[in-house]
Design a protein with these regions (language model features):
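The feature marks proteins involved in alpha-glucan
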Residues: 1-16, 37, 42-123, 134
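Short secondary-structure subsegments characteristic of cysteine-rich extracellular domains
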Residues: 128-134
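Aromatic-lined carbohydrate-binding/catalytic grooves of carbohydrate-active enzymes
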Residues: 134-179
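Alpha-helical scaffolding segments of alpha/beta enzyme cores, especially the outer helices
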Residues: 130, 179-182
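Residues that line or immediately flank small-molecule/substrate-binding pockets and catalytic motifs
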Residues: 31, 118, 147
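Short beta-strand elements bearing conserved aromatic residues within extracellular beta-rich modules
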Residues: 27-29, 60
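Short proline/glycine-enriched turn/loop motifs at strand-loop junctions of beta-rich domains
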Residues: 20-27, 55
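Conserved, mostly hydrophobic/aromatic
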Residues: 19, 62, 114, 135, ...
Length: 185
């Protein structure tokens, strides 16, 4: 197996959901909401792209060589868990209020390592954001989140992540992570 192809970056295609499948002879995009199966277009170095952009919020899965539905391994949103279809998430629509934040010196800072699932009874990023004042009152200067990548089930430490770019849905998904980051700054 060649190692040079996997280092090739994904083609810049925007919301056309590229996937790297160098051994596949055919890759289809399955859209569960309509049942549509769309053949993807082969690109160089083993990349495949959908023939048209997908709107934000569209659920999709890949089928390699006529096989079962597979989630996007680079998905940012897995609303039905790590084995379910992926959903298009457009981070450009997020609203940020932390433009004035300029950071702080790490030297002498009190850093709190936060596990989202156990920090509050709800176990969500939104609930954790509501408790940031509590941490500040304890003298905490910075929060370091333990891994938030998608994993099977509801409870985990995050080190067994499956969808490394997707925020665990039980924590609130990618939009909740953005709200938490905004609140923390």
């Amino acid at each position: 197996m060649s190692t040079s192809s996997w280092r090739s970056p994904a083609p810049p295609v925007g919301p056309r959901v590229p996937v790297w499948a160098p051994q596949a002879a055919r890759v289809d995009l399955h859209l569960p909401a309509t049942g549509e199966v769309v053949p993807m277009e082969a690109r160089e170095h083993g990349w495949w792209v959908s023939p048209r952009p997908l709107p934000t919020g569209t659920d999709y899965a890949y089928r390699l060589d006529g096989g079962d539905d597979l989630p996007d391994p680079r998905s940012a949103w897995q609303p039905d868990g790590v084995h379910g279809p992926s959903r298009v998430f457009d981070a450009s629509h997020l609203t940020w209020t932390d433009d004035g934040w300029r950071g702080r010196d790490l030297l002498g800072a009190v850093i709190y390592e936060l596990h989202v699932g156990t920090f509050t009874p709800e176990g969500t990023l939104d609930a954790a954001a509501r408790r940031l004042d509590h941490l500040t009152g304890l003298g905490v200067d910075m929060v370091e989140l333990m891994p938030v990548a998608g994993f099977p089930g509801r409870a985990g430490w995050g080190y067994d992540g499956v969808d490394l770019w997707a925020v665990h849905e039980a924590y609130g998904g990618p939009a909740a992570l953005a709200r938490f980051v905004d609140a923390a700054h």
